[in-house]
């Protein structure tokens, strides 16, 4: 999965997919009542990027729906996965469950079209704080209450705080999650970060009894870092330059080893070599 980083304006969906991304990451900010409000990152953000692009969250969902609904004039068949980077740092811990409920209602209405031929992309809810694990239950309970438990088949989870792998496992246990787990590791492109924790996450994924299904590394903009990440066995790389990742994947060392994921590749099934 080549994951386009910080895709917060609707026009950027096409821009990143056309550069080679089959997945995008979108920031979601919340208002004081835990309603998802804008797709907005704000300052500071990655070096070389504008941090201030935004849409109203519901408008973005509608744009995303057209980009991922077969038959729509805006349809991009390659776009198969969307990571919502949930900026829950602005919320009190006791609002996490409420944020999950509201997120579920927004997605159900504006993205899934109330279960009636909505967008088809898989969704990863990425949460920065382990204490906000109740967001997951708020989300899953709401989809069930609204009569659409089948949509949970399209939803996965990520804790993005670079916490110890064991602590992340405990948070999932509390949230009642087993499966559909992506594990992120990384840092802004302005700084360097080694691959120690990525390798630990990959080992957990491949152990047969770990909690992780997929591992992605962020933010990867350089060819050398891309090669290191692919060598470490990641499933996804998040990048500001999808074309750079695509180029590296076409190099002799990689072109027979890795390929771009398609809609038929489940993002929840651990790849067995």
From Swiss-Prot:
Cofactor(s) the record lists: Mg(2+)
Principal location: secreted
Any one annotated GO CC term: extracellular region
InterPro entries per record: PLC-like_Pdiesterase_TIM-brl
Keyword presence, Lipid metabolism: yes
Family matches, as SUPFAM superfamilies: PLC-like phosphodiesterases
Pfam short name (any one): GDPD_2
Gene Ontology process terms (BP): killing of cells of another organism; lipid catabolic process
Disulfide bonds: 45-51, 47-190
Localization: Secreted
GO molecular function: lyase activity; metal ion binding; phosphoric diester hydrolase activity; toxin activity
Stated name of the protein: Dermonecrotic toxin LhSicTox-alphaIA2av
Catalytic activity: an N-(acyl)-sphingosylphosphocholine = an N-(acyl)-sphingosyl-1,3-cyclic phosphate + choline; an N-(acyl)-sphingosylphosphoethanolamine = an N-(acyl)-sphingosyl-1,3-cyclic phosphate + ethanolamine; a 1-acyl-sn-glycero-3-phosphocholine = a 1-acyl-sn-glycero-2,3-cyclic phosphate + choline; a 1-acyl-sn-glycero-3-phosphoethanolamine = a 1-acyl-sn-glycero-2,3-cyclic phosphate + ethanolamine
Active site residues according to the UniProt entry: 5, 41 (nucleophile)
Function description: Dermonecrotic toxins cleave the phosphodiester linkage between the phosphate and headgroup of certain phospholipids (sphingolipid and lysolipid substrates), forming an alcohol (often choline) and a cyclic phosphate. This toxin acts on sphingomyelin (SM). It may also act on ceramide phosphoethanolamine (CPE), lysophosphatidylcholine (LPC) and lysophosphatidylethanolamine (LPE), but not on lysophosphatidylserine (LPS), and lysophosphatidylglycerol (LPG). It acts by transphosphatidylation, releasing exclusively cyclic phosphate products as second products.
Keyword annotations from UniProtKB, A to Z: Cytolysis, Dermonecrotic toxin, Disulfide bond, Hemolysis, Lipid degradation, Lipid metabolism, Lyase, Magnesium, Metal-binding, Secreted, Toxin, Zymogen
EC number: 4.6.1.-
Cofactor note: Binds 1 Mg(2+) ion per subunit.
Record-stated family: Belongs to the arthropod phospholipase D family. Class II subfamily.
Top-level EC class as recorded in UniProt: lyase
